[in-house]
């Protein structure tokens, strides 16, 4: 199963690697393959000072954890996503959050589900007919099998 991972999921795993989200990302087997646009790395880097404030980890521990999480994600260059797909994703995310365009575009391009904790994004996308989501609970069940 292929899953596109949104930044808020990785952010949550960094803040608490022992959480269910952290455990799913860090200890997933070959059943689930995680993908993300390279933009995720930029977003995490942009929030590194916030991460430092919210965790009890020192710099080397934070970067070690980020490296472990990144090792579990297949990063795809945004340049590989067709322009038509980007246009569709742009329309779907209008009025919500421009930063989510690449994640939606990648999910469309790979024909897979999006794992996000952004309820507003999910609601808005569902209203526009996008229903390719997977929940943390569903991923936990898949991992159990």
Predicted region positions:
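Alpha-helix capping/helix-boundary segments
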Residues: 9-10, 40, 103, 120-121
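Acidic, PIN/NYN-like endoribonuclease modules and their adjacent C-terminal/linker elements
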Residues: 36-37, 108-109, 113, 117-145
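PIN-domain endoribonuclease scaffold, especially VapC-family toxins
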Residues: 28-30, 35-87
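Short amphipathic alpha-helical segments and helix-helix/interface helices
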Residues: 22-25, 63-66, 103-104, 122
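Active-site neighborhoods of divalent-metal-dependent phosphate/nucleic-acid chemistry enzymes
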Residues: 75-119
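Short gly/ser/thr-rich secondary-structure transition/capping motifs
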Residues: 16-17, 57-59, 97
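Short, well-structured N-terminal submotif of metal-dependent ribonuclease cores
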Residues: 1-36
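Residue-level signal for well-ordered alpha-helical positions
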Residues: 17, 47, 127-128
């Amino acid at each position: 199963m292929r899953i596109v991972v949104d930044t808020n999921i990785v952010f949550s795993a960094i803040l608490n690697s022992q959480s269910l989200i952290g455990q799913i990302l860090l200890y997933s087997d070959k059943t689930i393959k995680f993908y993300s646009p390279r933009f995720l790395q930029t977003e995490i880097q942009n929030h590194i000072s916030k991460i430092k404030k919210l965790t009890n980890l020192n710099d080397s521990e934070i970067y070690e954890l980020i490296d472990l999480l990144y090792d579990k994600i297949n990063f795809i260059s945004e340049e590989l996503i067709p322009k038509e797909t980007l246009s569709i994703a742009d329309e779907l995310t209008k009025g919500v959050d421009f930063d989510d365009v690449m994640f939606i575009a990648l999910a469309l391009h790979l024909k897979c589900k999006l794992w996000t904790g952004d309820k507003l994004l999910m609601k808005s996308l569902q209203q526009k007919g996008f229903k390719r989501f997977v929940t943390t609970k569903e991923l936990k069940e898949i991992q159990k099998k």
